[in-house]
A protein has these predicted regions:
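C-terminal non-catalytic regions of proteins with extracellular/luminal or membrane-system context
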Residues: 1-223
Length: 223
């Protein structure tokens, strides 16, 4: 599908209460190393109070009809993030990816906003969240492992034949990690908010669970 228009952070940021001192491309989307782009971004990061770093997987890294052979984001993006973190500790990462990725670099980000596959108007939506105009209320719909080797699929992919082997049985997703006591990067259902919530009057019945949910913060939010 071809979008009618595409908003970018660079285009939209002037509409928000952010004093932007500049933008830099930083890396090639196709994964090639480019020291000129990297140096330009690092120099700009050194001058900034806060860095908003947009990174993730492009349409060539994940797509219908093919399986990824690893869970890493392109190395040139990681190297840029690590280089900027050496000159500026206030990095807000805005991640775009349609599925779980390894995050050995997560400590380089003081905050991390996951946009998944945001679409043509995602830049404005991300800036709404970053500036507090909107409250992030999303929760991870999948577990983010520390590394690919920690996943139950690691031993059986790729298959030697044209078969996909599913050996998890009942232990799909978080059930596997909980049962096997495997440490994860971010658990299923993880997500932060600009407000806080209180659970009370918990009642467990044969048909389900009921409780009273109260927003105890100063901002509207969903839980």
């Amino acid at each position: 599908m071809n979008p009618t228009k595409v908003e970018t952070m660079e285009q939209m940021i002037s509409s928000y209460p952010i004093q932007c001192i500049g933008t830099a491309k930083g890396y090639q989307r196709t994964g090639e190393a480019d020291e000129v782009l990297k140096k330009e971004a690092v120099n700009l990061a050194e001058k900034a109070d806060v860095v908003i770093y947009c990174f993730g997987l492009d349409e060539l890294s994940e797509s219908e009809g093919l399986d990824r052979t690893h869970m890493r984001i392109p190395q040139n993006q990681v190297e840029l993030l690590e280089a900027m973190a050496k000159v500026n500790s206030n990095i807000v990462g805005v991640l775009s990816a349609g599925s779980a990725v390894e995050m050995p670099w997560h400590s380089c980000c003081k905050a991390l906003l996951h946009g998944y596959l945001g679409g043509q108007a995602s830049a404005g939506a991300m800036l709404d969240v970053l500036t507090g105009k909107a409250n992030p209320s999303g929760r991870l719909s999948e577990t983010y492992p520390v590394r690919y080797e920690d996943t139950p699929a690691f031993k059986y992919f790729p298959s030697t034949e044209r078969n996909s082997e599913y050996r998890e049985s009942l232990f799909v997703g978080y059930r596997y990690y909980d049962t096997s006591k495997v440490r994860v990067q971010y658990p299923f259902g993880y997500g932060l908010s600009y407000t806080s919530f209180e659970y009370s009057d918990l009642r467990v019945t044969a048909d389900g669970v009921e409780f009273v949910l109260t927003n105890t913060g100063k901002m509207d939010g969903a839980e």
